[in-house]
């Protein structure tokens, strides 16, 4: 149903200037959830954004706005009146409003804050004090607080009165008079209470609360969601006072951003939080060029090695034919090892102190892999390629050594990077491949000199 409605809406928007069937548009839009409507907005030219936004169901307008990319949000803001902008900002959850302020240029931020009501403006300024990549920077202050001496009936009355403006009421947080976090109670427990008029919150709350500090790194926060399976995690200050919560939707966004950043770094690109088609040619060039330039310069070491062994290649020219196979095998082996280690470090399975165990494990795997590849390759060289056994031995011994060295290097570099406070993702495929290429050539030519006496 959703896909059909989206297609219908796109068709109607293509002929909007001619049809002017606004009521029909409203009817179609009322059947779609906010994320689907936001996807339609992303495809519209800037001049049509305000028209469509004014037709949105009022209860979905802020939610749709929060789903848009910063570029589309700015285009939409430029087309809204101050009154319309105020309605949107006031309906946004405070963490979404803070994200909006962080993403917009100064002139747009000034306009947003001017339209926000004083309470919202105060909460936004409070959240902006925290680092962007910390729990304080991604939390919301719109949460449900209860007191330990309340009865369940009093708590339910408070939720009915104030819960509509809270980001979530699935879990309610119990605080004392100083706002110190002392417990958590679920809405389920409150609803299912058998004696709501007499049962106290302190008697049913869970006082073993998992919380994070305002300075906790956002990646660590997202890992806690994965570990505990929570829908929200409370955030406390240095004095253990409750200041906000991080919700699961923000945790998912953090995971997506961190994964995108790691993928970009693992492929020698600068990370970008913009969709592909929202990036200009210059941005794409800027994200890719520095690493490609560095890798091109670093690959000259391989050229220097080859020039240094020109005599060996001239004596046994067939050695040249197997250089690509050896360097590719080494690069692939190193990349597999690196990717496995980086992934393990990202999810907390691997710590820097595990380095000796990592190297021993990778060495044993490399022996098995290298031996298997060498046996298969030796049979191919002798029976299919008709290569002399001494040359085949050189190639296969190099293959074993290359796989071992590559996997050891691939296991070593991410851990070393972590210890030196570098991002382990930087030590990924392109850089590993460059290092392994040079190492492979040195091993290859030296084995050839020894076995072939050249």
Where in the sequence are the language-model features?
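Generic intrinsically disordered, low-complexity segments enriched for polar/acidic and small residues
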Residues: 50, 441-442
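Extended alpha-helical regions
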Residues: 154-157, 435, 439
């Amino acid at each position: 149903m959703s896909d059909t409605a989206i297609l219908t809406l796109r068709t109607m928007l293509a002929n909007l200037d001619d049809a002017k069937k606004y009521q029909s548009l409203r009817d179609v839009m009322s059947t779609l959830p906010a994320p689907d409507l936001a996807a339609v907005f992303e495809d519209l030219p800037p001049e049509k954004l305000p028209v469509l936004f004014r037709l949105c169901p009022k209860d979905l307008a802020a939610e749709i706005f929060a789903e848009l990319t910063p570029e589309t949000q700015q285009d939409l803001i430029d087309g809204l009146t101050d009154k319309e902008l105020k309605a949107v900002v006031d309906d946004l959850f405070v963490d979404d409003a803070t994200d909006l302020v962080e993403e917009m240029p100064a002139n747009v931020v000034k306009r947003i804050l001017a339209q926000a009501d004083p309470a919202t403006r105060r909460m936004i300024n409070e959240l902006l004090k925290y680092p962007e990549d910390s729990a304080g920077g991604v939390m919301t202050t719109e949460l449900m607080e209860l007191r330990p001496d309340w009865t369940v009936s009093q708590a339910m009355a408070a939720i009915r009165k104030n819960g509509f403006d809270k980001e979530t009421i699935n879990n309610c947080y119990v605080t004392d008079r100083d706002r110190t976090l002392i417990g958590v109670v679920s809405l389920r427990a409150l609803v299912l209470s058998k004696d709501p008029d007499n049962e106290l919150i302190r008697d049913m709350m869970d006082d073993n609360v998992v919380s994070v500090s305002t300075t906790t790194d956002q990646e660590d926060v997202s890992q806690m969601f994965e570990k505990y399976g929570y829908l929200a995690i409370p955030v406390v200050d240095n004095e253990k006072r409750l200041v906000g919560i991080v919700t699961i939707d923000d945790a998912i966004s953090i995971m997506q951003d961190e994964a995108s950043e790691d993928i970009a770094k693992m492929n020698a690109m600068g990370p970008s939080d913009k969709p592909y088609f929202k990036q200009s040619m210059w941005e794409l060039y800027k994200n890719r060029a520095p690493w490609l330039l560095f890798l091109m310069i670093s690959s000259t070491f391989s050229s220097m090695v080859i020039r240094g062994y020109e005599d060996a290649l001239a004596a046994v020219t067939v050695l040249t034919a197997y250089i690509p196979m050896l360097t590719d095998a080494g690069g692939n082996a190193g990349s597999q090892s690196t990717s496995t280690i980086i992934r393990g470090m990202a999810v907390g399975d691997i710590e820097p102190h595990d380095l000796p165990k990592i190297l021993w494990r990778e060495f044993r795997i490399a022996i098995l892999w290298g031996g298997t590849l060498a046996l298969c390759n030796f049979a191919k060289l002798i029976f299919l390629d008709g290569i002399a056994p001494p040359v085949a031995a050189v190639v296969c011994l190099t293959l074993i050594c290359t796989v071992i060295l590559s996997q050891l290097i691939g296991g070593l570099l991410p851990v070393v990077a972590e210890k030196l406070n570098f991002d382990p993702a930087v030590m990924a495929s392109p850089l590993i491949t460059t290092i392994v290429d040079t190492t492979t050539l040195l091993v290859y030519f030296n084995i050839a000199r020894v076995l072939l006496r050249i």
